[in-house]
Amino acid sequence: PELRIAFEDHIRTVAGHYRGRVYAWDVVNEAVDDSVAGLRSTVFSRGLGPDYVAEAFRLARKADPEAELVYNDYGGEGLNRKSNDVYTLVKDLKQRGLVDGVGLQMHISASSFPAVADIQANIQRLADLGLQVNISEMDVRIKDVAGDAATKLARQRQVYRDVVAACVAVPRCESV
């Protein structure tokens, strides 16, 4: 009961305090597990059950009905198990009228990142759900790229260029 009370009070207090003044809320961040299908084992999933994500969005919607509500996660840039789990989660939330957008965190390596076509396909399938898509975080590591500094930086520029192009190609991808 204490966790539920704190969970509900926090969302109501923060979203309610800024009601009408904040464009969008990242309501839930990084809930999908990296290693196994489904949600990560956290204090919230263990203490409140698997529907805590939907409950957080319900509470946020009630506290600030005009704000865009966003689910945000990393590791699902292209088409993979994690991006499929994120897709399944936000599809369910969208069908319930709870989520408006999804943020994709891209912490990627210039030496091994998803194919640009896969990144664009993932953005497109999220947009096809009626969601606004944002690349909410992005960094491109160059430590493992072979070559001198100029070569590494050129590769990094190309990765940034490719990801931005993938976003721009999908009308509902709003920002990088």
Regions found by a protein language model. Name each.
Residues 95-97, 123-128:
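Short, conserved, surface-exposed binding loops centered on an aromatic residue
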Residues 2-67, 71-88, 97, 112-121, ...:
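Active-site cleft segment of glycoside hydrolase catalytic domains centered on the general acid/base Glu
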Residues 68-78, 104-110, 126-159:
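Active-site clefts of carbohydrate-active enzymes
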Residues 22-26, 66-70, 99-103, 130-135, ...:
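Structural preference for beta-strand elements that scaffold enzyme active sites
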Residues 156-176:
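Substrate-binding cleft of secreted/luminal carbohydrate-active enzymes
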Residues 88-91, 121, 162-165:
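A generic local structural motif
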